[in-house]
Amino acid sequence: MEEAVRISKILSELGLCSRREADTYIEQGLVTLDGKVVTELGTRAYRSQKVELKKQAAIQQSSKVTVILNKPVGYISHLDDDKAFRPAASLIIQDNFQVSKQHSSRNPRFNTDGLAPAGRLDIDSSGLLVLTQDGRIAKTIIGEQSVIEKEYLVRVE
């Protein structure tokens, strides 16, 4: 017999959003189960049921920012609560922020709040770092089912 699972897990498995984002959408009343709005966190459903995001959730998702950054040595990938180290996200400022041609007509606000690294490079490493507000992108890059290959070049003295 099929087991009921949390709606947030179903939405994540469908690739519509991360579990955390799903919880936010549920709280905002932007998720439907068989056509009825769901607002209670932890609500369970069967995978055979129809779970959907409302259009307002898609609008929220389209405003999320993803940044590709060449992280230099001396910066950390994540935010530092102790303020002892400089986070790579601090390198992203209005003066060096560019919008892709595909999204230039949307006139996005410069907003880097909530950027999270999709992967990590330690303080002594440099290289490509993806910072995103979109859980779908993070899951695609570093999730358990990710097929994206990561390559590291290590130099030893």
Residue positions per predicted region:
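Basic, flexible Lys/Arg- and Gly-enriched helix-loop patches that mediate nucleic-acid binding at interfaces
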Residues: E2-E157
